[in-house]
């Protein structure tokens, strides 16, 4: 029998269907073959029994050389995405090269080739790190493969779809084959809460959720926190920030806020009637401590960089509201990164006009961790995203609330 | 001085064959925090700080750091031909599998005996991932 023969040859336990074997034998081209080879290796690492279908994927494309290699391996091998597969931001190449002359040529070439590779693969060219809001939205219970720090926990916890903590390449491979190995968070038992997090801190805005995510991720590291005590329902942006930060300061692929998030309505259900491994509490003091850790300095700034993760329409409205009737100080460069879809609406609603009128820029398709910011290499800036500061593409990036960032941009310095 | 071979079964994750001097790390490794041109570990306070992972059979508990930097880190080492020859790990997760896959370095785990007890830094090790076998050449006085 072909199946058992193949299993024997590979010396492994994972069951593969006839179609999967034909893909591995190269019958559908080298690109798809390589994609499945990677998925099988991952499945073997986790003792997955078999592959399961995914209905969509998000590849955290990055414009780095390792990323480029894999994208071209698949694209040159004739692969096409089998299910909707969205892409992360790289950078808006024509736009930035018009503004900055000094972006290194080789880096620009890598970015160009990465973007072209995804185009050839037939991916959704979203170039957005929050695709789950507009371009590629999973439903409750859907099986997907979403990489990207805010996307993985958001999709698992807020939407209640199922994804593992994917790398860009494993998510792309899943999008190309339309499958992923059955392991990890695709299995209900593995979606059990691990840590009880008792929150009594006041959470008044999006930045407080950034701090909460930072603190929880750092304390727990790897695990599935179950947060209690949050009385007011968090909004989309607050949840995005919590996801992004907890999955950067730690490795949080999923969390529960029983009663607020969809998968478990009670604490007991979130822990699947088991006991928590550990318990932590978050009071105002812990949030302040997190803030103090992130505070880097005050003084003169050269730039403000917002939109990590990409700002939503609501956040663009907030920026416009804060900048209305004001001017950004000469010498300060003010940037907001967002998705192409959010920008279209922000333009229509007049927010882009206000931000640009004040001297700022609203840029699409772009991540703050890209070579396009080369001009700020030796500059000091300010951001509302600790994730942005962590990338270290700048001499220094102070972290503060959006209001403080706008204030610093207008005054030319952080008080 | 005589030599003795210890042959252990292992679990293949990424196939292939690699041999070289063993380098044992009890701490997780971030490939991004090595010098891409020499393979020397640059991470301060790491037990391998200042040592090169180039051409070694690396024995380590797991990878660490974000997927983007980890994968790109190993990729850059391979471009400069200073990547390890084989990887023997304890806790293998998705990012480590992807990293080894794109640079085509054999990756194995689950040796039939604890790798950290059997393998010493400096011993010559052959990793035949295809056959699922790790061979350690023990030097004995």
Regions flagged by a language model, labelled:
Chain A
Residues 1-10:
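Intrinsic disorder/low-complexity segments
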Residues 9-415:
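Non-transmembrane, aqueous-exposed alpha-helical and coiled segments at domain scale
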């Amino acid at each position: 029998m072909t199946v058992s023969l193949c299993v024997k040859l590979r010396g492994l336990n994972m069951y593969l269907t006839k179609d999967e074997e034909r893909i591995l034998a190269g019958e559908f081209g080298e690109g798809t073959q390589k994609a499945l080879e990677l998925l099988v290796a991952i499945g073997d690492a986790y003792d997955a029994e078999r592959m399961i279908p995914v209905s969509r994927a998000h590849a955290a494309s990055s414009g780095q050389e390792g990323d480029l290699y894999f994208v071209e391996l698949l694209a040159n091998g004739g692969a096409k995405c089998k299910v909707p597969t969205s892409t992360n931001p790289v950078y808006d190449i024509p736009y930035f090269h018009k503004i900055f002359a000094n972006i290194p040529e080789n880096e620009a070439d890598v970015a160009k080739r990465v973007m072209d590779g995804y185009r050839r693969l037939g991916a959704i060219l979203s170039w957005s790190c929050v695709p789950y809001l507009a371009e590629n939205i999973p439903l409750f219970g859907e099986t997907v493969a979403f990489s990207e720090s805010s996307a993985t926990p958001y999709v698992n916890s807020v939407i209640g779809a199922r994804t593992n903590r994917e790398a860009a390449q494993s998510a792309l491979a899943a999008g190309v084959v339309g499958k992923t190995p059955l392991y990890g968070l695709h299995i209900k038992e593995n979606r059990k809460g691990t840590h009880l997090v008792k929150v009594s801190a006041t959470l008044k805005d999006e930045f407080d959720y950034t701090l909460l995510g930072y603190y929880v991720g750092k304390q727990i590291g790897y695990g599935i926190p179950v947060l209690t005590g949050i009385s007011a329902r968090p909004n989309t942006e607050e949840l995005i920030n919590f996801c992004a930060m907890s999955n950067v300061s730690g490795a949080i692929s999923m969390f529960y806020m029983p009663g607020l998030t969809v998968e478990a309505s009670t604490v007991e259900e979130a822990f699947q009637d088991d006991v928590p491994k550990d318990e932590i509490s978050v009071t105002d003091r812990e949030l302040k401590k997190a803030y103090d850790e992130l505070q880097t300095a005050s003084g003169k700034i050269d730039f403000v960089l917002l939109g990590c993760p990409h700002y939503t329409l609501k956040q663009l409205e907030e920026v416009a509201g804060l900048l209305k009737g004001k001017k950004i100080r000469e010498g300060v460069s003010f940037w907001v990164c967002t998705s192409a879809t959010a920008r279209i609406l922000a333009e229509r609603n007049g927010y882009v006009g206000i931000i640009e009128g004040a001297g700022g820029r609203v840029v699409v398709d772009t991540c703050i961790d890209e070579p396009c910011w080369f001009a700020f290499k030796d500059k000091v800036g300010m951001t509302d995203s600790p994730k942005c500061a962590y990338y270290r593409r700048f001499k220094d990036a102070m972290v503060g609330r959006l209001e403080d960032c706008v204030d610093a941009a207008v005054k030319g310095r952080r008080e | 001085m005589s030599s003795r071979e210890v042959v252990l079964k292992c679990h293949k994750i990424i196939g292939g064959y690699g041999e070289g001097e063993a380098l044992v790390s009890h701490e997780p490794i971030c490939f991004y925090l090595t010098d891409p041109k020499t393979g020397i570990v640059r991470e301060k306070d790491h037990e391998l700080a200042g040592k090169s992972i180039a051409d070694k059979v690396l024995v380590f508990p797991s990878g660490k750091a974000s997927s983007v930097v980890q994968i790109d880190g190993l990729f850059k080492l391979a471009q400069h031909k200073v990547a390890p020859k084989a990887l023997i790990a304890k806790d293998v997760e998705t990012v480590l599998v992807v990293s080894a896959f794109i640079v085509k370095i054999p990756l194995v785990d689950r040796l039939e005996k604890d790798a950290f007890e059997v393998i010493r830094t400096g011993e010559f090790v052959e990793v035949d991932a295809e056959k699922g076998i790790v061979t350690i050449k023990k030097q004995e006085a």
